[in-house]
């Protein structure tokens, strides 16, 4: 099974993350940030990846450290669970609607971390959650998962819907990209014979 557990402890956060890439989309998430928990639950459900996140952070300061560090740990867990990436589909893209919002998410599990994030929010906050932290999370996740990730909201008016379409779009793209391609016969999907270099 393609699983991994990452523990990360700093002076700002104490985080434990587990993933099962071949799961059923089960989630057990507690970060102390309600909206963020909701996004991570959506990520698990729509990716089919089982995700457990337990985080204690300096929420008395703000949500930044917890959000970013969960992205770091979750990215590291996905990378570890992928192993040598043999047999994976590698590329995937999706257009994800959420009511009036449409976002496009395209992924390459390349071993080369890049984030292109073209998303604008009409509001600074969703409840108590700073919308600028959505990009911070995607940046931390992409860099530590070692993936090339393009996220663009084509249009949308509601900040909650925009964020949700981005997380769900990532989920559906991940679901397809990490899937084992039966035609690959276990080969690494690269003419170089390896990914990440």
From Swiss-Prot:
Tell me if Cell wall biogenesis/degradation is a UniProt keyword of this record.
no
Name the principal localization, coarsely classed: cytoplasm
Task: Name its cellular compartments.
Answer: Cytoplasm
Q: What is its EC number?
A: 4.2.1.19
Kind of enzyme, top EC level? lyase
Per its UniProt record, what SUPFAM superfamilies does this chain match? Ribosomal protein S5 domain 2-like
Q: In which pathway does it act?
A: Amino-acid biosynthesis; L-histidine biosynthesis; L-histidine from 5-phospho-alpha-D-ribose 1-diphosphate: step 6/9
Q: Name one GO cellular component term.
A: cytoplasm
* Database matches in InterPro entries: IGPD_sf, ImidazoleglycerolP_deHydtase, ImidazoleglycerP_deHydtase_CS, Ribosomal_Su5_D2-typ_SF
Look up the domain of life of the source. Answer: Bacteria
Tell me a GO biological process for this protein.
L-histidine biosynthetic process
CDD domains, per the entry: IGPD
MF annotations from Gene Ontology: imidazoleglycerol-phosphate dehydratase activity
Give coiled-coil spans as residue ranges. none
Q: Does the keyword Cytoplasm apply?
A: yes
Q: Which family does it belong to?
A: Belongs to the imidazoleglycerol-phosphate dehydratase family.
PANTHER family listed in its UniProt record: IMIDAZOLEGLYCEROL-PHOSPHATE DEHYDRATASE, IMIDAZOLEGLYCEROL-PHOSPHATE DEHYDRATASE HIS7
Matching entries from NCBIfam families are given as: PRK00951.1-5, PRK00951.2-1, PRK00951.2-4
Task: Please identify the protein, giving its name as recorded.
Answer: Imidazoleglycerol-phosphate dehydratase
Instruction: Specify the species.
Output: Afipia carboxidovorans (strain ATCC 49405 / DSM 1227 / KCTC 32145 / OM5) (Oligotropha carboxidovorans)
